């Protein structure tokens, strides 16, 4: 535990020191920043805010993790597990970096196409499966102690899990501080699970990433000086999925990650309902005022009769939801 706390503090300090330089470099180069959605007028003032801040905390977290792992976890099993998780984080970080790079530096509005991004995400999931899952012989989902053996279909599950949650965290990263703190809450919950299982190698990775993310939040809370970009959100979602698999507690991510599930479900429901009503009635209708769900809250709270919610209020509501969900999972597992 001391090692994890020490590593987390170092990650916090290095990220906190590096981030201002990254922001300053971004501004000096006069690089085009984040584009804002016009439907949420309070966001228009953020246009041009530097993005790709995930580059900093990912480089810090992965570098420190490799160093600490090589020094303190020299056995093949721990190194294999740590390498598998870090590799998928790096791969998804690179995918996000390419997407951000095309949007900002090459002025390609959509960045990578949906097909390109999905293909690269599948490749990243396959790498994780080959490096970590196959050598461990895992082919079952653990649900409340009952193991559902899937055989080859477990590969499909791993790909679905990693790709799905990487995109879910990406959707969550829509207002200042929401994704960064939500992921910290999720990681802390998995830190408790890792500690209870004696998985101190995974606990180390969690501690380092939590430290780096808390430092990033110093610059990402409202009003944000920088956004994490796809480079950060895609990598964090993949990391959460990989950790839930590594700890053999896959189902818990549906609850611990309730915020990401809610954000993604809102988009899927909105699109499906809009297409259905357009076909049936000749005009598309909506369930939510705007998706992902955090924008629905911004534009009128839960009931729609309330005044527009501030970003801090939306953040607080969704952070609290994630915290309560995480505590419920821990209570189910250990009480």
UniProtKB/Swiss-Prot annotation:
It is found in: Cell membrane. It is a multi-pass membrane protein. GO terms for biological process: cell division; cell wall organization; peptidoglycan biosynthetic process; regulation of cell shape. It is an enzyme of class 2 (transferase). Coiled coil: none annotated. InterPro entries: Glycosyl_transferase_4 (IPR000715), PNAcMuramoyl-5peptid_Trfase (IPR003524), PNAcMuramoyl-5peptid_Trfase_CS (IPR018480). One of its GO terms (molecular function) is phospho-N-acetylmuramoyl-pentapeptide-transferase activity. Belongs to the glycosyltransferase 4 family. MraY subfamily. This is Phospho-N-acetylmuramoyl-pentapeptide-transferase. The lineage of its organism: Bacteria, Bacillati, Bacillota, Bacilli, Lactobacillales. The gene is mraY.
């Amino acid at each position: 535990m001391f090692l994890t706390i020490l590593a987390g503090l170092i990650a916090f300090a290095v990220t906190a020191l590096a981030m201002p330089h990254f922001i300053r470099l971004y501004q000096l180069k006069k690089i085009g920043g984040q584009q804002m959605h016009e439907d949420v007028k309070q966001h228009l003032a953020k246009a041009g805010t530097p993005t790709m801040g995930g580059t900093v905390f990912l480089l810090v977290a992965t570098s420190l993790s490799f160093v600490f792992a090589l020094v303190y976890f020299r056995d093949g099993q721990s190194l294999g597990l740590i390498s598998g998780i870090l590799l998928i984080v790096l791969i998804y970080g690179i995918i996000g970096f390419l997407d951000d790079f095309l949007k900002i530096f090459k002025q390609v509005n959509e960045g990578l196409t949906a097909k390109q991004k999905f293909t690269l995400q599948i490749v990243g999931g396959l790498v994780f499966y080959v490096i970590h899952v196959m050598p461990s012989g895992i082919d079952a989902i653990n649900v409340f102690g009952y193991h559902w053996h899937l055989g080859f279909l477990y590969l499909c599950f791993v790909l679905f899990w990693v790709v799905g949650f990487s995109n879910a965290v990406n959707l969550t990263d829509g207002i200042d501080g929401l994704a960064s703190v939500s992921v910290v809450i999720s990681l802390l919950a998995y830190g408790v699970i890792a500690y209870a299982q004696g998985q101190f190698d995974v606990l180390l990775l969690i501690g380092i990433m939590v430290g780096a993310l808390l430092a990033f939040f110093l610059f990402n809370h409202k009003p944000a000086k920088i956004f994490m970009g796809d480079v950060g959100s895609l990598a964090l979602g993949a990391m959460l999925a990989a950790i839930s698999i590594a700890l053999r507690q896959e189902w818990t991510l549906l609850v611990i990650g309730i915020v990401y599930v809610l954000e993604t479900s809102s988009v899927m429901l909105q699109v499906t309902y809009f297409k259905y009503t357009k076909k049936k009635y000749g005009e598309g209708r909506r369930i939510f005022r705007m998706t992902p769900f955090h924008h629905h809250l911004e534009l009128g709270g839960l009931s729609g009769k309330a005044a527009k919610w501030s970003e801090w209020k939306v953040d607080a509501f969704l952070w609290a939801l994630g915290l309560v969900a995480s505590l419920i999972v821990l209570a189910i597992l250990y009480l």
